[in-house]
Design a protein with these regions (language model features):
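Cysteine-nucleophile amide-bond enzymes
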Residues: 1-209
């Protein structure tokens, strides 16, 4: 469904660094934007690529990788359209190489990094509005429609049940795993969505070695 976040378990050196820093299997995130808008009407993902920057790729681009689909819950059609429009407006922006070099330096040196510093390291970057990494691009797009990912609950909660106040995290501090951890995204398993029937599995007579 357009607006779904697709998490990817990559195997490059940078992917390994991201997975270590975030203590997660997920090193990359894409946004499913639906129709490419071209004459081919190809279904596409939007991502921030190291070499090509923010781009559209075919839906099947990561078909050989371990994936997880995270679907925003109760997203209205209007907000879904605004979300995708915001993300598409970043097409052509370049990748935030400063953030990449921070991760490469960490991977080469392999310092002892306390847990409390890991998010801060990921949050490093150039800060330029025309540069992004995969998860910050998607996080900024969701924040543009006020959709929560992992907000911070403020102390302004009254004794008589007033609505609590939430604070946004800066979008540069989000990592792919945050969409998996968010209570506001539903994890979708494609094999179940298409109608899984365990009785249709053909089992071999012996166990795998």
């Amino acid at each position: 469904m357009p607006g779904d976040v697709v998490l990817v378990e990559g195997d490059t050196r940078i992917s390994v660094a991201i997975k270590y820093l975030t203590q997660s299997s997920w090193s990359h995130a894409c946004l499913f934007v639906g129709d490419s808008g071209s004459s081919s009407h190809e279904l596409c993902l939007l991502e921030a690529d190291l070499q090509e920057g923010v781009r559209l790729i075919p839906l099947q681009h990561y078909s050989g990788f371990n994936l997880r689909i995270c679907r925003p819950v109760s997203l209205t059609d209007q907000d879904r359209g605004q979300l995708i429009s915001h993300a598409r407006s970043r097409l052509g922006h370049t990748y935030d190489l400063k953030n990449v070099w921070d991760l490469v330096r960490f991977l080469i040196q392999k310092p002892a990094v306390p847990n409390r510093w890991r998010r801060a390291m990921i949050g490093l970057g150039s800060g330029e509005p025309t540069r992004a990494i995969c998860s910050t691009l998607i996080a900024e797009s969701f924040q543009s429609i006020n959709y929560p990912i992992l907000p911070v609950l403020g102390p302004e909660v009254g004794d008589e049940g007033e609505v609590p106040v939430y604070y946004r995290r800066h979008f540069s501090h989000f990592t792919p795993r945050d969409f998996d951890l968010s209570p506001y995204f539903e994890v979708i398993k494609p094999t179940l969505e298409v109608g899984f029937d365990y009785q249709q599995i053909s089992w071999a007579g012996e166990e795998a070695s």
